[in-house]
A protein has these predicted regions:
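Extracytoplasmic gate region of multi-pass secondary transporters
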Residues: 30-34, 216-268, 300-304, 409, ...
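Conserved MFS/SLC helix-loop-helix module at the cytosolic interface between two early adjacent transmembrane helices
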Residues: 63-101
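Extracytoplasmic
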Residues: 11-39, 43, 152, 235-240, ...
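C-terminal ends and interior cores of transmembrane alpha-helices
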Residues: 86-99, 291-307, 384-387
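Cytoplasmic helix-loop-helix junction between adjacent transmembrane helices
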Residues: 107-144
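C-terminal membrane-cytosol helix-exit motif in multi-pass small-molecule transporters
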Residues: 180-200, 470-478
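Glycine-rich segments within core transmembrane alpha-helices of 12-TM secondary carriers
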Residues: 135-160, 432-442
Length: 489
């Protein structure tokens, strides 16, 4: 770390953030591209195949974050970042020639290395700034997560343009070529303008560099990051098919809504860094995990239209049914009024309904001339419950959740320079690995949950459980170490 920030520090921060934004945009391309190809039946892929193709790039990027962080600590960020950008451009370009699931998966595995750029940028940014600015600067760098929003916002429009609005589906192959060119251009810019710098620990052996991984705190931070980053990555992709299938949106519109989730989450990360510097990461994380638990719980209830047996009418005495109408049943002079089906549910989708709506009515089950006994059913009750899961309310909650996770991402990484100032690359890489694994496993888990339950909201059930476990683990850990804590945990 430097004692003071300089103009060179700010230049490196800008280049790191720019390169990370480009890499993150590439990393998230399958969320849009795979959904587009499956929706338009270019390839016959179901939810599980889609989940795997979304997860494979994230897996690659996650696994290689640790070695990327170690290489950055050893050789500095410039050579590692430049090599990564050029290498990843190759499989990104080859994706344009993929014709089946296997070739798509192999190319996705290759360009997924762009996800390792996070560990490089974290370590390379950290060495240029003093400890007091670590939260803010790492938060600014992390705003490169907004690259996901750039993909979900612009890639659907580009796909429509290249395919002539679906009349030439082979035109999709142009999109990977454009993304590959972006990586090459970014690599050239980084090579020409970045300056290299190594941390003081660069002379350590590889084994010595890995020693912090014995500390349980590293794994706990990684578990938090599994939620706030891994799930952010997962939903940056999963929300596109979510909006398409649940709210019947065109893919371009779904991409815009997904971008509204991912863009604020990326940009607000800088605010999370500032908040962590000012108030302490512990307080911020309490708020993040508690709010994540609450919002996830609120999103669990699915969009539904349920019919259930309600309060019926039974005969008070035996007799012959003399008249049956929509409003009344007459049994030898004994009249039984019926609740008529209301018109409450007409044009419900044109309204904004926050809570479930109910209507109740009764329908005759007897006919004129029929003999009925005492307590025999004359009319059955019907209860209809409709929950709109209004798209605007859903979108607001999802955007709020994404923004909260964005602040949480910065809060998690605020801990690392404080506890491991000379091993930021290794520890940051390992935490990034665990967080990135969330981005890999979650779309796959979502796919299996969807297959098993038939409910798209099953993913929010998983988020609720995960958020609650993180909150409990953090609280128990803080209680155990509070007498030794200095305010950062």
């Amino acid at each position: 770390m430097q004692k003071e920030a300089t103009a060179t520090s700010h230049k490196i921060l800008f280049l790191n953030t720019l390169a990370f934004t480009a890499c993150f945009a590439v990393w998230m391309i399958n969320g849009v591209l795979v959904t587009y190809l499956a929706t338009n039946q270019v390839f016959d892929w179901g939810p599980i195949e889609i989940g795997w193709l979304m997860g494979i790039p994230v897996l690659t990027g996650s696994i290689f974050r640790l070695p990327a962080g170690m290489l950055t600590d050893k050789f500095g960020g410039k050579p590692v970042f430049v090599i990564l950008l050029f290498i990843c451009a190759v499989p990104m370009f080859l994706l344009s020639y993929a014709n089946d699931f296997i070739s798509f998966a192999l190319c996705s595995f290759g360009f997924g290395l762009t996800g390792a750029s996070f560990a490089i940028g974290i370590a390379f940014t950290s060495v240029w700034y003093p400890r007091k600015l670590q939260g803010t600067t790492l938060g600014i760098f992390g705003a490169g997560n907004a690259g996901a929003a750039l993909t979900t916002l612009f890639a659907p429009t580009l796909l429509n343009t290249y395919t002539a609005n679906g009349t030439n589906m082979e035109g999709w192959r142009m999109l990977p070529k454009v993304y590959a060119a972006m990586l090459v251009i970014m690599g050239i810019i980084f090579f020409l303008f970045a300056e290299n710098k190594k941390p003081a620990s660069s002379n350590k052996t590889w084994v010595k560099m890995l020693s912090p991984l014995k500390n349980i705190r590293v794994w706990r931070f990684g578990f938090y990051y599994f939620l706030v980053f891994g799930c952010f990555v997962a939903f940056s992709q999963w929300l596109v098919p979510y909006f398409v299938n649940v709210y019947y949106m065109p893919i371009v519109t779904a991409g815009i809504f997904a971008a509204l989730f991912s863009f604020p989450s990326g940009v607000i990360r800088a605010l999370g860094g500032w908040m962590s510097d000012k108030h302490g990461a512990r307080k911020v994380m309490y708020w993040i995990l508690g709010t994540s638990t609450l919002i996830s719980f609120m999103l669990i209830v699915p969009k539904m239209d349920i019919y259930s047996p309600g309060k019926g009418i039974m005969a008070q005495r035996s007799g012959i049914v003399t008249r049956v109408s929509e409003t009344e049943i007459d049994v030898e002079g004994k009249k039984y009024p019926l609740q008529v089906k209301p018109t409450t549910f007409e044009n419900l989708d044109d309204q904004v309904l926050v809570f479930p709506t109910k209507e109740v009515w009764q329908e005759s089950v007897v006919t004129e001339g029929q003999k009925v006994l005492k307590k025999e059913l004359l009319a059955k009750g019907v209860t209809r419950i409709y929950f709109q899961a209004n798209v605007w309310i859903f979108a607001v909650l999802v955007i709020l959740l994404g923004s909260i996770w964005g602040i949480g991402k910065a809060a998690v990484y605020k801990h690392i320079p404080d506890y491991f100032p000379e091993e930021v690359g290794v520890v940051g890489g390992m935490v990034g690995v665990l967080g990135g694994l969330g981005g890999f496993f979650c779309p796959i888990i979502f796919g299996y949950l969807l297959e098993g339950t038939g409910l798209y909201t099953s993913c929010w059930m998983f988020m609720f459980i995960l958020s609650f476990v993180c909150l409990v683990w953090m609280h128990r850990s803080i209680m155990k170490t509070s007498k030794f804590s200095s305010g950062l945990e």
